[in-house]
């Protein structure tokens, strides 16, 4: 999956910082730092499928970033980001 552009709506940016203590910068780092990506669910309309990216920030923080991928524009639209759960972290370690 090729990601050329990363978009984070302002309302999502606020939620990431207030609810999950994750900055957009950290979420971008995960998406650009060779994450493990998995399909989460099919979108209601074609081209709006949800994916999860699991990886590390440059500071070493393990995050799960959820995004909608627009293949025609190679764009990831960030929907949510949070610390990896213990189960996700264990699975990520087996990469």
Predicted features and spans:
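Ribonuclease/tRNase effector modules and their secretory precursors
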Residues: 1-95
């Amino acid at each position: 999956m090729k990601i050329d552009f990363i978009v984070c709506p302002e309302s999502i940016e606020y939620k990431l910082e207030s609810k999950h203590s994750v900055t957009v910068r950290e979420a971008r780092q995960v998406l650009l730092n060779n994450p493990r990506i998995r399909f989460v669910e099919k979108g209601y309309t074609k081209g709006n499928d949800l994916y999860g990216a699991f990886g590390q920030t440059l500071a070493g923080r393990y995050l799960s970033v959820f995004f909608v991928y627009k293949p025609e524009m190679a764009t990831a639209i960030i929907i949510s980001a949070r610390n990896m759960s213990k189960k996700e972290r264990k699975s990520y370690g087996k990469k």
